[in-house]
Amino acid sequence: MIKNLSNMKNDNQKREKCCEYIEALEEERRKINVFQRELPLCVELVTQAIEAYKREISGTSTDNLYGQSECSEQTTGECGRILDLFIPIKHSSTSIEEEVDDKDDDDEEHQSHETDIDFDDKNMKSEWLKSVQLWNQSDAVVSNNRQDRSQEKTETLVELIKINDEAAKKNNNIKSPVTTSDGGSGGGGGRRGQRKNRRCWSQELHRRFLNALKQLGGPHVATPKQIRDIMKVDGLTNDEVKSHLQKYRLHARRPSQTTPNNRNSQTQHFVVVGGIWVPQTNHSTANAVNAVASGETTGIYGPMVSSLPSEWPRHSNFGRKISEDRSRCSNNGFFRCSSPAMSCSTRTKTKDAKIIS
């Protein structure tokens, strides 16, 4: 920047530029003075730049003065030579004294300026030394602060551990029963006490639930949110409606799934009577009575009695056994058979034969 100023020919422009630079640097120095201890070298560089610009301004002013004096000396010298030829000129004592006084003033100003510079340098050195001492002290302070913080952390951790132990002891000592909506009670700590009680679905609430399902088209079409909006019950949540809807769907599926299983579970029981396989009628009638008493239906038709087997088991001695029974019972006038079905049929036949005879 100083080289650029030296290249400028106009002295007024040089002064204006130097003044602008000096003002800007002074503002920067004011900002840096806040951090003078941390940035001593920056302050020193800025002050040196300000002094350099001031010297540049003083140099331009002295050049102007020297130029004017040289011109005046040249003019006076030429005039003096001309006048010396005609009139002897004598220097007055007052002019000499004034020149001496001016020189003395210039010397004093120069000395005062040098003393100011020396004083500023000494101040900067002292401040720099102070900042170095502060830096050395700051390391020790930082280490002390770290130790203090570590001690505080350990103390706080110990206090927190004590508080947690006391709270755990209190929770173990306190046992409060928590009653639920189902009527059961159980001992528990604070966690069970904070749990939300299950909703008890009353008949009125279930009736509203069924009406909502009818309006929406059935349990497989309706959604929990739609059901809750139609029911309009305070405090009823979507989760509660969802759980109740799932239970209702399972309950609706049970009859259609259990009835065919019950049919298949009714096994056919047979009894061997006189070498003949005969179904056990008591078992079938008992099953029919139990089915009627229990009220199990298929959903469309009423209770049904298990049917007789379509095919009877075959036996090799079936014809021979019947002939033997006929020969034994021919004397009495009717057939006697060990099986109840055959005995009934033979008795009816003999009675009809007697009536005809």
From Swiss-Prot:
Matches recorded under SUPFAM superfamilies: Homeodomain-like
Cellular component GO terms, alphabetical: nucleus
Principal subcellular localisation of the protein: nucleus
HTH myb-type domain mapped to chain residues: 193-253
Compartments where found: Nucleus
UniProt key word DNA-binding: yes
GO biological process terms on file: cellular response to phosphate starvation; regulation of DNA-templated transcription; response to nitrate starvation
Record's protein name: Transcription factor HHO1
Organism from which the protein derives: Arabidopsis thaliana
